Structures are given as C-alpha cells and as structure tokens.
C-alpha cells in the first residue's frame, strides 16, 4: 500500500463484523452494521507539541484498535482497498491478546 500518513494520523483497515440475528442467522457486511474495530496499517511520525517536540504515537502497525467512527474519520480507497484515515485521538483503545 502506497500511503504515508502525516503527523498524528493513522491508517486503519476496518475489520468486518460478524453477528447473529435473533433467529441465529449469521449476518456479515452491511447487514451486520459497520465495525468500529480495525487493524492499524501505516502510522505518522507523531503529534507535534506546542513546544515543537514530536510525541511518538502509542499505536503501532499491526495493532487491533477500537475507534470512534465519527466526523474526523475519512474513508479512502487505496490500491482497490478501502481504508480509514484518522487522528490517533479517534482511537479509543488497543485490543490486547
């Protein structure tokens, strides 16, 4: 994938949700709703602080994260693959194994 996020931006690939209906039918894709979990792909070099220093990001490539799918999250198609571009502040948690 040829994309390099800047500053505190993170590229995330949304994980597909699998859920079951009340009748036990497995729902996937749009029927299941949009997932707010994803895998972190490239990350920027960090957030620029008021004093000019760069604070490295807490998330790293390969992390599974839970994110806020709101106003600041941008959806883009890169190399025929849909990805999300967001600030690290849009990430709510890192899922640990």
UniProtKB/Swiss-Prot annotation:
Gene3D superfamilies from the entry? GroES chaperonin
The record's subcellular locations are:
Cytoplasm
Q: Does the keyword Transferase apply?
A: no
Residue spans making up a coiled coil are none
Chief place where the protein resides: cytoplasm
Keywords (A to Z) from UniProt? Chaperone, Cytoplasm
Q: Cytoplasm: is it a keyword of this entry?
A: yes
| Gene Ontology terms, MF aspect | ATP binding; metal ion binding; protein folding chaperone; protein-folding chaperone binding; unfolded protein binding
Describe its partners and assembly state: Heptamer of 7 subunits arranged in a ring. Interacts with the chaperonin GroEL.
Q: Which family does it belong to?
A: Belongs to the GroES chaperonin family.
Please state what the protein is called: Co-chaperonin GroES
User: Which organism does this record belong to?
Assistant: Yersinia enterocolitica
